[in-house]
Swiss-Prot record:
Organism: Eremothecium gossypii (strain ATCC 10895 / CBS 109.51 / FGSC 9923 / NRRL Y-1056)
Protein name (Swiss-Prot/TrEMBL): Putative transcription factor SEF1
Listed Low complexity bias regions: 11-21, 206-218
GO molecular function: DNA-binding transcription factor activity, RNA polymerase II-specific; transcription cis-regulatory region binding; zinc ion binding
Residues annotated to bind DNA: 92-122
Gene of this entry: SEF1
Region of interest (Disordered), residue spans: 1-54, 67-90, 206-227, 738-759, 927-968
Localization of this protein: Nucleus
InterPro entries listed in its UniProt record: prtT, Transcription_factor_dom_fun, Zn2-C6_fun-type_DNA-bd_sf, Zn2Cys6_DnaBD
Length: 1051
């Protein structure tokens, strides 16, 4: 073959030489044409020859791959390339597509290294042309493919493990893994979250100074690193706010130290002595490992050998952390399902802020708030450092903020609550992360942490932000800034796979947004409210829309959702109660508001049978708070029918009792919305005692505020508290009141003037019987059903309580036959205001042999019958224990009864939440010399001023007559001032003139107050409520944080 090739080459060369030689002599044109054709044919023949030679050489080279390589292979390749004019294709199609080096020609007939590693089919195709496209998209496709394979492996974990256990090789692998992990189990580690603004958590000053001077007189590396970290102008951030994808050199010095330790501890061979003798890993002295969410995965796996979590000075063992994690998943997550979590260590590796937030929330179920109080301030600081200083690239941060919004951190005043700011922060972070764009989130960030079912939980988080903002906007009376987008609309229509409760709550939140936009976003008025004349028709349409939602979604199938649904109804009615709304539009919603509010309180009492109040999310507690406040307003107005007044009053008392009915440690150690609501009710009740005219001076239900949307109700009531305080220090007002009293004629029920009737309120304003503690030995409950169908439960003192109260009064110098003033610290004036007792009941004609009178359900008893009613003592509790009053008292709802009320004390004995450790305070213990009053117990600390003002009773006069007893609390009289009794007498005369003593068929008869109504005889209950007022301090009644040092006092 080589001979033929050479001969052909020689012929071609000779022919080319002849053709290239110049022509000799003259020839014809035909000869020239023939010559040119010959040259063309020769060129074609040479090209064909070259292609055949190239194909033959390729075959020869391929055939030679199976054996040893020829030493002249490179020379042949160069000859072939020079002969063909282009390089032969030696790379496979995959390597040509990615433009990477390929060794397919060297590995033939095997695949190239990359295709063999990737499991791809390797082929050489000279006709293949690389496709032009985005390498990033290809990488995304590969990542999705890997994720699919990983999910398949995870789902097949059980099959793989069983297969490994059934094979010899698998058992050997498992045994090797156990041997490798066994030394790590002997040395646990503690992971710590550092706070930048607390350098003592990194290392204290003393430890830094002591570690600077080493025994050799030089500086240790760790001391230098820590001191350098402490002197930085910007402190290092060693939590979720650490920058993402940072290299080691750009990290803070202390974090570099932790990484150095971590890498050395894991890279040290197990057999070396240092791994066993290092004191840092011993159980006694454990070196903290700094774990960050986004910088690098410091924890080897979700099952890392962690035995302690540290934040500041709080140490949580792994067993306690697992317990709290289980409590959160079981009790709290169903209320707000925006995340999923399986293990504590995995949760910590995902986000430290989310981990500590879950630990804090689960601590609400502890019997004592010790751990909760220790974590609260630290987590607030951690949230600020994580979110404000740098922008975290994780959805977990938004989830943590939303959890803090639903179970708020402790706060005393409304403006101190960070929840609304946390909602806004979570919303802004989610915007930056692209949570509002779902699958297009990659267009916003490429450094976000990954999680299983990422798009599902990101969407849940975005929906949770929408709900939380609507809830907190309604609480504070602020307009919502969220708008309905694609995800909210799809969720509302049921296109997403959401839990039923969460779907219903989102629908109600969407309705709240529509309600606020329609009624409170007008550009025609400065307060933003719709024109008063148009409110009625708009509210009617909104009420029909809410009824339609209820018929479709069945809100009443879930008590939690039903409470929030009724809260949405109360929001509609509140818009109707705003100033300038026509009276007809207001009155038509009064009864509906009463029914909705009392239903909320009934549902709460049922829910608290198996759940503590503090475990409920804010949207449930706000529904109850709003119901109590609107009932307080309604029961003072003439628009509420008389048959509902007693039930409304008792509903308010029930809320107050439940809100004060927490475990002693929680009631005294934590201030939040629960304690604030109870305090607001107590302050309002004190205003009802001292300045009741404030509530009836203006026409309408809500009369003084108007620009807070549905939150106007709360601010209108708070205004009454501040106005009462202003009048208390206003001497001009008191002088004018005294002048009006002197000019006012004395009126009786029969001779009342028309002018007096016009100026007098239309309804008596009685105080509410709030109390903090009661024992079954002193009071028993009697339930009545009025002709209007309202169930009313009253407290009736027992025979033993009355005897002990009389004994105590006589020991203090009281005269025989004088009516008693209080029983176990509860003023009888308050019980008398609700029809519980009669003046004759506490007289000296009490006979122990008086039988118990039956209480008719169809008609209220006559005063004489009530006077003779002495209920028997209830049976003692099992084990001889007595429980305080602040336990919810329940009864089963009767048919066609709109309210559920308290039952007898025997029912309360079976309730789950008890405080057996509290000392028992009864009337007998008080009579025997126990100076503690009802509110002097640890359940509600006695004010310091009350302790100072307690004085022993003066001795009797020589002539045998008892000395005149001083007022129980002189400071209260000082606060009320010299004109207080005159003002109360003036107000009482107005009430008597406006409300003649006529029997009311819908209400139980009220006994004449007599001396019991005198203001100086109020017991410690009112002293406790007025503690801040008496001390001249506004801190206790400044619920909003309005008072400022620069504010004018007349404001």
């Amino acid at each position: 073959m080589s001979t033929d090739v050479s001969e052909r080459g020689a012929e071609a060369g000779s022919s080319s030489g002849l053709l290239s030689s110049p022509c000799v002599g003259d020839g014809s044109d035909s000869a020239q044409m023939k010559k040119r054709n010959t040259e063309t044919a020769g060129m074609k023949a040479r090209k064909k020859l070259r292609s055949e030679e190239s194909g033959l050489s390729t075959l020869v080279s391929i055939a030679s791959f199976g054996g040893q390589a020829s030493p002249d292979r490179s020379k042949v390749s160069k000859q072939q390339n020079g002969a063909s004019g282009h390089r032969p294709v030696t790379s496979c199609t995959h390597c040509r597509q990615h433009k990477i080096k390929c060794n397919a020609s060297e590995n033939f007939p095997s695949s190239c290294s990359r295709c063999e590693r990737m499991g791809l089919q390797c082929e050489i195709d000279p006709q293949f042309r690389p496709k032009k496209g985005s390498q990033l998209q290809n990488l995304k496709n590969e990542i999705e493919e890997l994720k699919t394979k990983l999910e398949f492996l995870l789902r097949s974990e059980g099959i793989l493990s069983s297969a490994m256990r059934n094979s010899d090789l698998g058992r050997q692998i498992l045994q090797a893994i156990k041997l490798q992990d066994s030394p790590q189990q002997q040395t646990g580690i503690s992971v710590q979250t550092y706070l930048a603004s607390e350098p003592e958590l990194l290392k204290s000053e003393s430890s830094v100074k002591s570690s600077v001077n080493t025994p050799s007189g030089s500086y240790s590396a760790s001391a230098v690193d820590v001191s350098r970290a402490k002197t930085n102008s910007v402190p290092p951030l060693l939590n979720d706010s650490a920058p993402a994808n940072s290299n080691r050199e750009s990290l803070p010095p202390v974090l570099q130290m932790a990484l150095k330790y971590h890498n050395s501890s894991h890279n040290t061979p197990i057999d070396t002595p240092s791994s066993h003798t290092t004191p840092m890993l011993s159980p006694e002295v454990k070196k903290p490992v700094v774990a960050t969410t986004n910088a690098m995965p410091l924890l080897p796996s979700p099952y890392a050998n962690i035995d302690e979590f540290v934040l500041g000075d709080v140490h949580i063992p792994i067993d306690k952390a697992k317990e709290l994690h289980h409590i959160f998943v079981k009790k709290y997550l169903p209320y707000f399902p925006i995340m999923t979590t399986d293990s504590v260590t995995e949760l910590y590796s995902q986000s430290q802020l989310l981990f500590w937030t879950i630990m804090l929330t689960a601590c609400l179920s502890d019997p004592e708030p010790t751990l909760y109080n220790s974590l609260a301030s630290l987590i607030k600081q951690l949230a600020i450092e994580t979110c404000w200083i740098r922008t975290p690239r994780s959805t977990h941060i938004s989830q943590a903020l939303l959890i803090l919004c639903n179970w708020p951190l402790p706060n005393q005043k409304v403006l101190d609550d960070c929840s609304y700011r946390f909602v806004g922060l979570a919303k802004s972070l989610s915007f930056q992360l692209g949570l509002h764009r779902g699958e297009f989130m990659s267009e916003f960030t490429r450094t976000q942490t990954l999680m299983p079912d990422a798009e599902k939980w990101r969407t849940r988080t975005w929906l949770g932000i929408f709900f939380a903002e609507q809830c907190w906007s309604s609480i504070l009376g602020l307009p919502s800034t969220s708008q309905t987008d694609y995800f909210i609309e799809q969720a509302r229509r049921g296109k997403f796979d959401l839990p039923v409760r969460f779907h219903r709550l989102l629908c109600l939140a969407h309705f709240q947004a529509s309600l606020s936009n329609i009624m409170g976003s007008s550009v025609e008025s400065p307060d933003g409210l719709m024109d008063a004349k148009e409110r009625g028709s708009s509210l009617a349409a909104l009420e029909r829309e809410l009824a339609r939602l209820h018929s479709e979604l069945k809100f009443d199938s879930d008590p939690v959702v039903e409470m929030y649904y009724l809260y949405a109804k109360l929001m509609i009615y509140c818009f109707a109660f705003l100033p300038e709304t026509p009276k007809a539009d207001q009155t038509q919603y009064v009864t509906e508001a009463y029914l909705a509010a009392t239903r909320i309180i009934t549902l709460l009492t049922k829910t608290l049978e198996d759940t503590q109040l503090i475990e409920l999310p804010i949207y449930v507690r706000q529904s109850v708070t709003y119901a109590a406040l609107i009932l307080f307003k309604l029961h003072l107005t003439p628009y509420l029918p008389e048959k509902y007044v007693d039930s409304a009053r008792q509903s308010i008392v029930t809320v107050h009792r439940l809100y004060r009915n927490q475990l002693t440690a929680w009631a005294t150690g934590v201030e939040n919305d629960i304690s604030r609501t109870a305090s607001v009710l107590e302050k309002l009740n004190f205003v009802l005692i001292t300045y009741p005219e404030i509530f009836v001076e203006e026409d309408g239900i809500i009369s003084r505020m108007r620009s807070h949307l549905t939150g106007t109700l709360f601010y209108d009531l708070i205004y009454c508290v501040h106005e009462a305080r202003r009048r208390q220090v206003d001497s001009e007002y008191n002088e004018m009141l005294e002048k009006n009293r002197k000019e006012q004629p004395v009126h009786t029920a029969a001779t009342g003037s028309q002018d007096t009737e016009k100026r007098a309120p239309k309804r008596r304003l009685f105080p509410l019987p709030f109390y903090n503690q009661i024992s079954k030995e002193d009071f028993e409950t009697i339930t009545q059903t009025t002709p209007g169908g309202t169930t009313v439960t009253t407290l009736v003192p027992t025979k033993n309580a009355i005897l002990q109260a009389k004994k105590l009064q006589r020991s203090q110098g009281g005269q025989k036959g004088e009516p008693i003033r209080s029983i176990n610290g509860i003023p009888l004036a308050m019980l008398d205001a609700t029809g519980s007792v009669n003046g004759a009941l506490v007289g000296d004609n009490l006979n122990s042999s008086v039988p118990q009178a039956a209480v008719a359900a169809s008609a209220p008893p006559e005063p004489a019958a009530v006077a003779a009613t002495v209920p028997p003592e209830p049976a003692p509790a099992p084990g001889g224990q007595s429980y305080p009053l602040f336990q919810p008292l329940y009864v089963q709802p009767a048919a066609n009864v709109p309210m559920q009320r308290s039952a007898s004390a025997s029912v309360a004995e079976a309730l789950p939440f008890r405080r057996p450790g509290m000392p028992k305070i009864t009337s007998e213990s008080i009579a025997s010399g126990n100076p503690n009053s009802l509110f002097g117990n640890d359940g509600s600390p006695f004010p310091a001023i009350a302790q100072k003002s307690a004085k022993p009773a003066p001795p009797a006069k020589p002539d045998g007559q008892p000395a005149k007893q001083p007022a129980p609390y002189p400071n209260l009289n000082v606060f009320l001032g010299a004109n207080a009794s005159a003002r109360m007498a003036s107000y009482s005369s107005l009430m008597d003139a406006a409300d003649p003593l006529a029997p009311d068929p819908d209400r139980a008869p009220l006994a004449a107050p007599g001396p019991l109504a005198h203001i100086s005889e109020l017991d410690s209950f009112f002293l406790q409520q007025s503690a801040g007022w008496i001390e001249g301090s506004s801190s206790n009644d400044d619920f909003l944080g309005w008072y400022d040092i620069n504010m004018a006092p007349e404001f």
